[in-house]
Amino acid sequence: MQQKKILFIINPIAGINKKKKVPKLAHQYIDSNKYEVHIAHTQYAGHAKLLAKKAVNDGFNVVVAVGGDGSINEIAQQLIHTDVALGIVPGGSGNGFARKLGIPIGRKQAIEVLNEAHTIQCDVGLMNDKLFFSNAGVGIEALIVNRFAETKMRGFVSYARWALHYYATYKPQKYTIRCDGMSFEKKALFINFSNSGQYGYQIGVAPELSDISDGLLEMIVVEHFSKWRALYLLPMFMLGKAAKVPYVDVIQTDKAHLQCESETDAQIDGDPAGKGADFEIKILKGVLKVIVPSI
């Protein structure tokens, strides 16, 4: 059997824990009859994208993202429309994309999944000119993401602290939404487009509707609600039942257009994506090969 070339791209600062043990684990648990293991560490923002592009050009068969949804985004951008498979060893804060695919959060177990070499073709989202793999959104959730990115403290507690801080003062925006031949207005705290059905941290978004290969996105529109109702909404998200909340609308669509009354924050896969008032969103069906557990 001819060995395939596999490259692990490690983001050493993603998430809460460092990734120092991954190279050792990769050499220890990857089947050497199947793969020739290579390791690379990112050194600055955007470096993962360059490493992945070089790997494609150099004939690698698998490129593994060791990090969170942001790291996956940088790497997977270079793999769409190619025969190079994306592997994932979760190492971020939320790990929403990996959770949706059933990839173990444990490093050893995630590495062992790569030996199975079982692949599926995943959909990819596009917001204006930016690709997303787990989800993208605008409004207060994106504002929170922007502030979360600026803090050194990672994890759910830090994210929740920023959420509580901004909810008290955030003013909902009015959006004009067009999709599936409809046009309507909503005053919303945020609008999220989910490919994976996951925010991360086990927080689900209409998981019963989400299929990462169905050619559809779930558009989640969350209207303004009282602070007391916030105590109800979070558990419903944690249980994957947000779609059953009266002030949450979930619409499946393959494309949509948002127009906001003023510029608002945007996020892509949990990373800041600037500001804007006009957003075109669509799905690219089955353009990314990903290694997932066979069962």
Predicted regions mapped to residue ranges:
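Short Gly/Thr/Asp-enriched flexible loops that form oxyanion-binding sites at enzyme active sites
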Residues: 71-84
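Internal helical hairpin/lid segments
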Residues: 192-233, 238-242
